[in-house]
Every structure is written in structure tokens, then in C-alpha cells.
């Protein structure tokens, strides 16, 4: 009887270790596919979750799922995936990605107040997403007519590539809304001088 019990315990432990190695290897492969934005990543995510429903990487997997949905402009599905995540289980380096994409998806659903709550978290620590979070936070403030905070955020990114041509338009509109007509004239002339062929 004792020998049988030892055999059973040994079998269970061996199986558990093999299973842990399997889901670990599969997760690393999935992570690589996600980083490369491989076309079959959504199918691999589904297969992984079906095969390993109790994986300790479920939060990371749902993050990948949500990001892919957001990038394909499927914002409701992105929000649904993000809501399955316990952000505390993600690494500190990964949390800005969650908060940025969640905030962005909410912004695209015109839920500006809630979007701000996520975008402002990204600003707390400098990351790849910080300048983009500042711009979209500015946009949320702008849409809710909180022009002073919008101005602060837009000014913080106005000189960054990708925002140099669009931000001045918001600054001009904010100046106009606040009755700063001299600034409107000054910014408009500066914009035309700097970007005469701007399509915005």
C-alpha cells in the first residue's frame, strides 16, 4: 500500500512538472507570435486558453487578446478582454500597456472620463506609452471642455514627432474657446509657416 501511494504521488508530481513545462513553452511561443503580430495569434490565444484554462499567465494572455482587438478597432471586445485582467498580476513594465490600450479603447467608445482614469495611470511612470497617453488624455480633456488640462497635456507633446502637425489645431481651438484671439492669430500663422502643406 505504501509503495502504491509513493507511486501515485510520484506520478502526480511528474505529470504536474511536465504540464508546467508544456504551458510555459506554449506561452513563450505565443508571446513571440504576439510581439511579431502574426496573423494567427488570435487563434493561438484561443487554443492556448482551451488547452491550459488554469494557466498562471491568463492575465498576460487576456492583455495580448485585448491589444490585438484594440489594434483592429474592435474596442468593445478589447474592453471585454481587459476587464478579465487583474492588473496587479502583470509586471510593472507591462501595466502601462494595459492602461494605455484600455484607456484608448474607452476613448474610442467616447467614455472620456473613464478613459482618463486609465490614461493618467500611464503618466505616473515614464514608458513607451507615456507621450501617447498624454496626447489622448489631452484629447479627453478637450472633448469634455476641460481646456486648461487639455492645454497642459497638448503642450507637453506638441514638439514630438507624430504630434507636431495635429496638436497646434487643438491649441488654436482652445485659445479661441477661451477668448485668446491674439494667440489664435499667432499660433495659426506659426502653423502655416512651419507646415504650409499640412493636411489637417
Give the ranges of each region predicted by the language model.
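Acidic, polar-rich low-complexity tracts and alpha-helical solenoid repeat scaffolds
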Residues: 1-5, 10, 16-200
Amino acid at each position: 500500500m505504501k509503495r502504491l501511494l509513493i507511486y501515485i504521488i510520484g506520478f502526480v508530481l511528474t505529470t504536474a512538472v511536465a504540464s508546467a513545462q508544456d504551458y510555459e513553452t506554449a506561452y513563450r511561443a505565443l508571446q513571440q507570435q504576439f510581439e511579431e503580430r502574426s496573423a494567427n495569434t488570435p487563434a493561438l490565444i484561443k487554443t492556448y486558453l482551451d488547452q491550459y484554462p488554469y494557466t498562471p499567465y491568463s492575465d498576460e494572455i487576456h492583455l495580448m487578446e485585448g491589444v490585438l482587438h484594440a489594434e483592429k478597432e474592435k474596442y468593445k471586445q478589447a474592453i471585454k478582454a481587459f476587464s478579465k485582467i487583474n492588473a496587479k498580476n502583470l509586471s510593472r513594465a507591462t501595466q502601462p500597456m494595459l492602461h494605455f490600450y484600455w484607456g484608448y479603447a474607452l476613448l474610442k467608445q467616447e467614455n472620456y472620463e473613464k478613459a482618463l482614469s486609465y490614461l493618467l495611470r500611464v503618466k505616473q511612470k515614464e514608458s513607451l506609452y507615456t507621450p501617447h497617453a498624454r496626447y489622448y488624455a489631452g484629447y479627453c480633456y478637450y472633448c469634455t471642455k476641460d481646456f486648461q488640462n487639455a492645454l497642459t497635456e497638448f503642450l507637453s507633446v506638441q514638439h514630438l514627432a507624430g504630434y507636431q502637425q495635429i496638436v497646434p489645431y487643438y491649441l488654436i481651438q482652445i485659445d479661441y474657446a477661451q477668448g485668446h484671439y491674439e494667440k489664435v492669430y499667432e499660433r495659426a500663422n506659426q502653423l502655416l509657416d512651419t507646415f504650409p502643406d499640412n493636411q489637417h
